[in-house]
Amino acid sequence: MLRVLPTSFKSISTRSAFRACQLSPLTVYCPLKSSQGTDIKSLEDLTKLKSLEGVDPELIRKLINERTIELNVQNELEMLKNLNKQEKMSQEVSLKRFVRPLWVFFLMSSTVYLILHYVWWKLEVVEKEKELQSHVESLEMELDQTLKSQNQNVSSSQNNGNNKTNDKPWYRKWFF
């Protein structure tokens, strides 16, 4: 009867333990009868005996070796399970190490974005104000030119009109 070990279990000591289990599994032993007439299949059977006087020392050695191999295999399996758990925990810890820096990065980048956006907006407003100010100045110049041209026309017409009205007496200006 063969015992099957997990495929991930690949250490050298487990291979030798596996070979030992193949060569001498507990179920393959023929129950030997001691001088007291009982069948001895395991170390537990040996503990039930009152004395070890009639028991074959070779059988005791084989049972002890077999039990030692089984315990070693169990210890190695537990060790591998613990190593797997530690590896998973170390992976989780490594992910936790990056969470805080990522939050800091996102907060810093959003702050930089908002500051740059505000600066861009402020520059746009200043540029628009300059553009509107230049437009207002051009309109004021045009208005001034128009007013000057109208004033010149009015003053020239008044000069022409003043010559005619100056010929009339002052009391006629009131009635006509």
Swiss-Prot record:
Keyword DNA repair attached: no
Annotated Gene Ontology cellular component terms: mitochondrial inner membrane
Keyword Transit peptide belongs to the record: yes
Mitochondrial matrix side: 29-98
Coiled coil: 123-151
Residue ranges with Low complexity bias: 149-163
Positions on the Mitochondrial intermembrane side per record topology: 122-176
Superkingdom as given in the UniProt entry: Eukaryota
Positions of region (Disordered): 149-168
The protein's assembly and partners: Component of the inner membrane assembly (INA) complex, composed of INA17 and INA22. Interacts with a subset of F(1)F(0)-ATP synthase subunits of the F(1)-domain and the peripheral stalk.
Known role: Component of the INA complex (INAC) that promotes the biogenesis of mitochondrial F(1)F(0)-ATP synthase. INAC facilitates the assembly of the peripheral stalk and promotes the assembly of the catalytic F(1)-domain with the membrane-embedded F(0)-domain.
Name used for this protein in its record: Inner membrane assembly complex subunit 17
